């Protein structure tokens, strides 16, 4: 399932982080087992991230443990409406010592369209995937556009992009370009006011 591959690779904030050692693993489901690896600045906090991609009655969750920067840890959570009743959601929990506690996924609110829309897309192996209209709901009045890549030993650089409606703009910094293995890098982070449908 392409969406499953996307969510496993999507988490654009996962990065290796000083001399602290943290668990490193990825898996489908609620937990994973991997190995300890040393962090390097500025990603010097241990953390656990849950990602969920949901579309209608189908939802898939993945877990990611790694070293994170303080800016990512402060993000705590995000919910992006990518259109077609589909969401990408994340819950981030960082801690001084392993194991980090979990954050729960509350159910999505039954929100109604609010008269705004954004370009929506979720792409893997491309930085410019086909856009469609994401109808914003509830408190979603911002458009998010994130582009990045992750370098793996095989198949190499994996580009990805994410666009959709969001309730507030996250404070994220661009990453320095590099080809270090098992790292994610942000190349573009744009957040602006959502577009408003013309009143009939």
From Swiss-Prot:
Mod. after translation: N-glycosylated.
Tissue expression pattern: Expressed by the liver.
Signal peptide: 1-19
Short name of any one Pfam family annotated for the protein: PLA2_inh
Record GO cellular component, one term: extracellular region
Assembly mode: Occurs as a mixture of oligomers. Tetrameric arrangement appears to be the predominant quaternary structure.
PANTHER family: LY6/PLAUR DOMAIN-CONTAINING PROTEIN 8, LY6_PLAUR DOMAIN CONTAINING 9
Described function: Inhibits basic phospholipase A2 isozymes PLA-B, BP-I and BP-II.
Name of this protein: Phospholipase A2 inhibitor 1
Species this chain originates from: Protobothrops flavoviridis
């Amino acid at each position: 399932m392409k969406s499953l591959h996307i969510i496993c690779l999507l988490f654009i904030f996962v990065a290796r982080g000083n001399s602290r050692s943290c668990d490193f693993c990825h898996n489908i489901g609620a937990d994973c087992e991997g190995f300890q690896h040393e962090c390097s600045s500025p990603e010097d906090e241990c953390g656990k991230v849950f990602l969920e991609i949901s579309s209608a009655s189908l939802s898939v969750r993945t877990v990611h443990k790694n070293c994170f920067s303080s800016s990512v840890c402060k993000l705590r959570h995000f919910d992006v409406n990518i259109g077609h009743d589909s969401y990408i959601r994340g819950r981030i929990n960082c801690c001084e010592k392993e194991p980090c506690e979990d954050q729960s996924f509350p159910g999505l609110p039954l929100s109604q369209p609010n008269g705004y829309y954004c370009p929506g897309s979720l792409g893997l192996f491309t930085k410019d995937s086909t856009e469609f209209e994401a109808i914003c709901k509830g408190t979603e009045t911002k458009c998010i556009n994130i582009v990045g890549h992750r370098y793996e030993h095989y198949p190499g650089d994996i580009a990805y992009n994410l666009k959709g409606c969001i309730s507030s703009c996250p404070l994220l910094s661009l990453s320095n370009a590099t080809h270090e293995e098992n790292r994610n890098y942000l190349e573009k982070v744009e957040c602006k006011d959502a577009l408003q449908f013309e009143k009939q």
